[in-house]
Design a protein with these regions (language model features):
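N-terminal low-complexity segments that are often proline-rich with Ser/Thr-Pro
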Residues: 228-230
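Domain-level signature for soluble enzymes in the chorismate/prephenate branch of the shikimate pathway
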Residues: 1-226
């Protein structure tokens, strides 16, 4: 049975790529905001949600850490997607015709070298896939986009240069969300299980220290922890 997977962004977003890699036969459901992507799972419009929570270069993603606890959804798995940017333009364009590179502001910051080498002027767009769509619709051979290979396929753009990102270890961690609890997706069933906890401590000295001490005495490894003020 085909499952629907919601994600934030336009068709061709890296989140859609992640959804298709985890669920190859899924029906991707693009949503304009993270709130909409989470609501689609809560309301039953989607079986799962594919949500990015942190990037190896840019750090954690927006307000996700605030939205997830309030969503009431269950994290049933995670997926690490290597982020590979393609420099793309309309058919007939080439490296001598392009003058601008359009993409999300974070993506532009992760592709500085190629823009400097080609003397391209950065243009900020709402998201990576959206920049590919806009370039495609413009028909302008002087405009290029930095987006996923999937976006180039969807919007019928030619890839002028492949994998142009500054750092090859650029990776985004996604969590897979479900309205109902499920067994963690470990493949063979023998992998390490990761648990995500959200808790609040009292506003007293050493409260966090004492809370974390419980993990130490139980020999529980903490992969990461973050604190937020109320």
């Amino acid at each position: 049975m085909t499952v629907t997977v919601s994600y934030q962004g336009e068709p061709g977003a890296f989140s859609q790529q992640a959804a298709l890699e985890v669920f190859p036969r899924c029906e991707p459901l693009p949503c304009p905001t993270f709130e909409d992507a989470l609501a689609a799972v809560s309301d039953g419009a989607a079986r799962y949600g594919m949500i990015p929570i942190e990037n190896s270069l840019a750090g954690r993603v927006g307000d996700i850490h605030h939205l997830l606890p309030r969503s009431g959804l269950h994290i049933i798995g995670e997926f690490f997607l290597p982020i590979r940017f393609q420099l793309m333009a309309v058919k007939g364009a080439n490296l001598t015709t392009i003058r601008t590179a359009e993409s999300h502001v974070v993506a532009l910051g992760q592709n500085r070298k190629i823009m400097k080498n080609l003397k391209l002027r950065p243009v900020v767009a709402a998201d990576t896939a959206g920049s590919a769509r806009i370039v495609s619709e413009s028909g302008d051979a002087s405009r290029a986009a930095l987006a996923s290979r999937l976006a180039a396929e969807i919007y019928n753009l030619d890839i002028l240069m492949e994998d142009v990102e500054d750092e090859k270890y650029n990776t985004t961690r996604f969590v897979i969300l479900s309205k109902y609890p499920e067994f963690a997706r470990t493949g063979t069933g023998t992998g390490t299980i990761i648990t995500t906890l959200v808790f609040r401590v009292r506003n007293i000295p050493a409260a966090l220290y004492k809370a974390l001490g419980g993990f130490a005495v139980s020999y529980t490894h903490l992969r990461a922890h973050e604190t937020e003020a109320d």
